[in-house]
Amino acid sequence: MSTSPFGTIVLAAYSPDPELFRRQLASLRAQSVEDWECVISVDGDPAPVAALVEEITEGDGRFRIVGDGSRLGFYLNFERGLLAVSERSTWIALCDQDDRWDADKIERLLPHLDEVSLVSAQARIVSYPSEKETGRTARQDHGPLFTLLSNEFTGSLCLFAPELLATALPFPRASTRVATHDHWLAVVAAAHRGTRIVDDLVQDYVQHDANVFGDPSRLGGGSIRQSVRNIRDQAERYEGSRSPRAIARMTFWTYVGWRQLMVDTLDRRIPESRIDARRDRVFGDGRRFRAASALLRVARRRGIVPARFALEYRASWLCGAISGGRRAVRRAVAAARP
């Protein structure tokens, strides 16, 4: 057993598989660091999840349920959990409902917060129910600009300092398909004391049919034709139409718009001394296509993004130009002022 300062584990739950949920909560209770509270933010009716938690944890008082029955989606459900973090917390960990942590996960990551604002690690990729290990993550921290361009930080692998919450909350408002909590938190952390990804394996990253995203390192495959179908489906769901203008808006928000939203929101919330002019030239309201293209070329050369990503990013820029993208982001930034 290890002694450590008090912290909070934020777990986002939605209709969890009872067996996977049982294993995950058991792995939390087995942590060598024991002084923590687990805030379980329930998307939807909290009663069934509360009953399951009571049964699994045998009344362990470290688990607390939050939720009012409303459906927020994955992104804003994590925001609700973070809003419930105790002011006593000296560290925060994000948790999915269906993974399984190694017993020393928190203990191994916690010392890094003396030097950086957010630390992430690696995971074994395990298929369920076969329990077969199909691979391991190979996340790398390429620095703040490349983190904005292509997120390598997976929320369930992260531990961060509560100093980030004053800047990160409320989350920027965008489509739940576009916006991701871990990308936003990594961007915020980079503007504070920095980020770090270590090589330690700290958990099983469980893959099954009900995953919201699956292993992020395996996303983005498929043909251009499949990408077009996906963006049409997303436009219909989030923009209410498959019209050319709706598809243009969705394409813009998927790449350029989401990154502009993060940067412009960040710049409103941090001291002027921490505003990065390079970041703004590539991603912010004053972004320049030449600066973005230069960064994409470097990212391609270093293998940070594939050629298809660079192509789709440039297409997203064009879609923003024809759909009033900059103005739409300005409105979204204003809507999410703390």
What are these regions (language model features)?
Residues M1-S227, I231, V329:
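Nucleotide-sugar donor-binding/catalytic module of glycosyltransferases
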Residues L169, A174-A179, H183-W184, L201, ...:
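C-terminal subregions of glycosyltransferases and related glycan-biosynthesis enzymes
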